Amino acid sequence: RFIQGRGNYVDDIKLPGMLSGDFVRSPYAHARIKAIDASAALELPGVIAVLTAADLKPLNLHYMPTLAGDVQAVLADEKVLFQNQEVAFVIAEDRYIAADAVELVEVDYEELPPIVDAFKSMDDDAICLREDIKDKLEGAHSPRKHVNHIFNWEVGEKAATDAVFAQAEVTVKELISYQRVHPAPLETCACLAAMDKVKGEITIYGTFQAPHVVRTVVSLLSGIPEAKVHVIAPDIGGGFGNKVGVYPGYVCAIVASIVLGVPVKWVEDRIENLTATAFARDYHMTAELAATKEGRITGLRAHVLADHGAFDACADPTKFPAGFFHICTGSYDIPTAHVAVDGVYTNKAPGGVAYRCSFRVTEAVYMLERIVDVLAQKLNMDPAALRMKNFIQPEQFPYTSALGWEYDSGNYPAALKQGLQAVGYDALRREQAEKRARGELMGIGLATFTEIVGAGPSRNCDILGVAMFDSCEIRIHPTGSAIARLGTKSQGQAHETTYAQILATEVGIPSEDIQIEEGDTRT
């Protein structure tokens, strides 16, 4: 139906009396707000209201909870902390009037020096970015070392690992940075909120990858019981983790609908999506390996400086503020390991989204495979041979890593051997040697990737108390047809087709007789 143009997205939904909202955004990465003058905008025909943090404060709605246990300004409160941060919300009869009115709102800023380098965020003379929590000594996950510090998280045996490094025959160390990236889904973020004041219920349509989490956040923020918050995610044009969290646009549309009693829609444009919604990666990883002269890895040590931007809005499990980064021993049998992660604030848009649901696994693998290559270079050893020497062997499964992961099965040597044969690895190395002898450059990349399937039991994996698992309810009608209601939400992959095919195979009902419902907190 998507290729036939029959998708139903948030912006396709029109409700009677619906208003539209648009944001006044900061041109500065760091600045104090001295004054906001919305008088000219309010005089424009069709403009209903202009909301600022001053309007939200009496309602205790000027800050919203993030999925990481932090709070984020819905509208900049006295200070802006990243370029294009939301400063005011204009509500008008349609989006075009709202966009025109945005240009009429005048904001007087006092520009402040920004911190955009994570390595400088905790300097002794670094300016305090989050003045709203400057006196808060205890973070959501650990004590705070500095006003711009978010958390410290460690896993593994530090003393044992340090002892291995002290006695190691060979060590290597490298700073490996994974730059900030943006998921950039085809459809930008959007929300349509409709408050029913008679029933005391609110219905919210939005680009939500995790509708149930959104319901929880809306309930926490508004005080409306979860049972009266109905969240619906229609078709979504791509997510990649960008649509897991809650954004100020959602909250402003919801608040406006509650106050005005009419439906209010917000749809961001491409520039807003690329500059103000959640980014990913931005990890600066100092990795070390200890090994024997023959290439047997004996220890891994890593420190990560995680740039989370102005607000910690990650969607990582509560117990794992660095996500699943501690999978960083990968496919290798490394006896000892220790990892420490420090999250910091900078004057950037919130970061740390689980881009493509990696939960930091991508960063972990990148760091590990790079440092293994560095070790291979130091030992003058073939990278494939070094990996073969250190793989977890088939007879070692089930295997528990030095950082606590339980591996159920695998045959990594056989997998790599098959891959090397498929690409003609030996021939490629000979070709590389010949070209280098002629002064030509030719590189051969090699990496292994151990992925986690399933987030884990809910006692270990939750976000804001919402367990990271999903369920499916299947009902068989007397006519022989079926309906399946799921907690998951596809983002353009047409999961409903796949789910129907799986059920058809298992139950023995034709897939065309199976109705799939997803993305609705009422089902």
Which stretches of residues belong to each language-model region?
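Flexible, low-hydrophobicity surface segments
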Residues: 1-143, 171-174, 249, 456
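Glycine-rich loop/linker segments at domain edges
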Residues: 1-4, 66, 140-191, 282-370, ...
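Flexible hinge/switch segments at interdomain interfaces of large molecular machines
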Residues: 10-19, 165, 184-189, 339-350, ...
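Alpha-helical support elements that line or immediately flank enzyme active sites
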Residues: 23-53, 89-109, 191-260, 317-329, ...
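Short, surface-exposed loop/turn segments at secondary-structure boundaries that line and modulate
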Residues: 51-85, 119-131, 209, 213, ...
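Beta-strand segments within the central parallel beta-sheet cores of soluble alpha/beta enzyme folds
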Residues: 53, 227-234, 261-271, 298-303, ...
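Phosphate/diphosphate-binding loops
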Residues: 86, 92-94, 258-309
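Helix-loop-helix junctions that connect adjacent transmembrane helices in secondary transporters/permeases
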Residues: 128-222, 393-481
